Amino acid sequence: MRLLSLAGAMALPLCVLAHPTHRTRGIARRGIDLTPYRLPGNAEYTSSRTSAMRSLLFERADGEDYVETAKKVLQSVHPDATFRVIDDHYVGDNGVAHVHLLQTAHGIDIDNANFNVNIDKNGKVLSYGNSFFSGKIPDSDPLTKRSFSDPVEALKAAATGLGIPLTADDVTSEGLDGTTSYTFKGTKGALSDPTADLVYLAKPDNTLALTWRVETDMNSNWLLTYVDAETAETIHGVVDYISDATYQVYPWGLNDPTEGSRQILEDPWDSKASEFTWIGDGKAKYKTTRGNNGIAQSNPDGGDDYLNNHRPESSSLKFVYPYSPNATSPSSYIDASITQLFYTANTYHDLLYTLGFNEKAGNFEANNNGAGGKGNDFVILNAQDGSGTNNAMFGSPPDGRPGRMYMFIWTESNPPRDGSMEAGIVIHEYTHGLSSRLTGGPANARCVDGEESGGMGEGWGDFMATAVRLKSGDTRQTDYTMGAWAANDPKGIRDYPYSTSMTKNPLTYAHLNNVTEVHEGGTIWASMLYEVMWNLIDKHGKNDAPKPDLKDGVPTDGKYLSMKLVMDGMALQPCNPSFIQARDAILDADVALTKSGNQCEIWKGFAKRGLGERAALKNGIRVDSFDVPKGVC
């Protein structure tokens, strides 16, 4: 399972080839290896508890727009910077306003220079994130000098340098916005016409590179490649948007066929979250697995023409199809697979909506029905996708463009198993879309791409999938694995089970020093969140219903409260956060949601796994701390 990975640890000449993909058992990276191009995270997060925030006296003046307050905060930190407000600001269901701003130079975006401000319901600044460029801005205006290469050369450089299977021999470019934005015509191999935008990119040596940001959607890799605009001979970094009626289904809470039997459910949608039901979009009603939140179909050849692919149809809206885990050919139960995938994705959509991932926060819906955000971005749900095996992927572009989920067949058992039948895999993949839309704002899908944030992207998926599958008799002594059924391995596809036992799972913050790929870092992060969740369950109890009970917008139990705080933390944290910054954002989420009612439980959970008060990154080495701040508990 993977989401976009931001690449570019250093600018690499085009003759340097990527290293072979490092694969772990089960859900791993695939396609083009972008590891050499990963950009290091450089964000700062000023939380509500820091002295810098306490000294920040800004409050929203009477009648003042919260966007203006955010501008004042930015200008107090970077008085000489030029910037623009990204048009994706919103007020979350916890009352916190989120404003995202992007630095500019000579009117050109600095694509990885972000600033986000969080303002509470009383108009006070709760926290802010900052990755603005602090070096010297070039004196000359490149738009005046026109000191940049032809964008066609940048497209060809991206294809050659990364080994993108794109034919661009007869390509032409069409200007969209003067001299800074282009669409390419005449290419072959991409799902849509590639584009190029002139942007700056802040480099690790604190200088700016003028680049063409070339977007190429190659199905299993959906790339933004930053090609030097002066020479067209250097790739400075890469982002990949792909991350590794009645329905007969395994109902919500059953992770896979080993946990129970399929049931026939009638009209299982939440009418508040899905006002058009799951099989309508406000314009039409469908008699198939198509609706406002997602369109599910088979995709055996791994292609992109999903609308014309097979999906089950029922004039009576009875999506009831046979399934046996022992069937020798997964294609024999494709209708059951599509129905299960459609059910799981829609149920998760409705749950996330209840917890705050709605239209204005950037959720995935075709028709937002005037509720904010951008529409036309349902999730394309491909069952038994033929573009891979033993894996799953999710592509999450910015708000207003459809997400894509690829569910594969797993061949580590005889007969093979269908990943759509393991709810945890579907939830993990969908959570990539959640974290991508909330972190950095709905309009910026480049903020879960750093060394640590990429790992947390995997960890959030594992955590949410594990929280959903908790059973009524579970306690903090209950352990869970990830992907065990699909992989035909009781140990699952992670190095350790999710457990509160340090014997069964010894992972701490310092283990990040030895991590070689994002799923290993994700296991560490999810292990921390698992500790926090059980601390909150011990305090507030556990609601085993498929949806939370809310009081003034706050879940009344510990399981759903932990999920809500994790989601609210995503919206608060800076673009490409570190573990420490993401921890602080969750603590700030509790400040905003419960008036600091759970600081002790949250701190104890993180501190148990080494992310306590004095945890630090020193000279490239992560140092554990098991301390809880004095006076918190």
Curated annotation (Swiss-Prot):
Q: Which residues are glycosylated?
A: N326, N514
Renumbered to this chain, the signal peptide range is 1-18
Biological processes annotated in GO? proteolysis
EC class, as a word, reads hydrolase
Keywords on record: Glycoprotein, Hydrolase, Metal-binding, Metalloprotease, Protease, Secreted, Signal, Zinc, Zymogen
What is this enzyme's EC? 3.4.24.-
Cited CDD domains = M36 (cd09596)
Q: Where does Zn(2+) bind?
A: H428, H432
Entry annotation: catalytic residues: E429
Note accompanying the cofactor annotation = Binds 1 zinc ion per subunit.
Query: What SUPFAM superfamilies does its record include?
Result: Metalloproteases ('zincins'), catalytic domain
Q: Does the keyword Secreted apply?
A: yes
One Pfam family it belongs to: FTP
* Propeptide boundaries: 19-244
GO terms under cellular component: extracellular region
Q: Where in the cell is it found?
A: Secreted
Give the main localization category.
secreted
User: InterPro entries per the record?
Assistant: FTP_domain (IPR011096), Fungal_virulence_M36 (IPR050371), Peptidase_M36 (IPR001842), Peptidase_M4/M1_CTD_sf (IPR027268)
Reported cofactor(s): Zn(2+)
Q: Which domain of life is it from?
A: Eukaryota
Q: What induces it?
A: Expression is controlled by the prtT transcription factor.
Task: Write out the similarity annotation.
Answer: Belongs to the peptidase M36 family.
Job of this protein? Secreted metalloproteinase that allows assimilation of proteinaceous substrates.
Task: State the protein's name.
Answer: Extracellular metalloproteinase mep
From the UniProt record, report the name of the gene that encodes this protein: mep
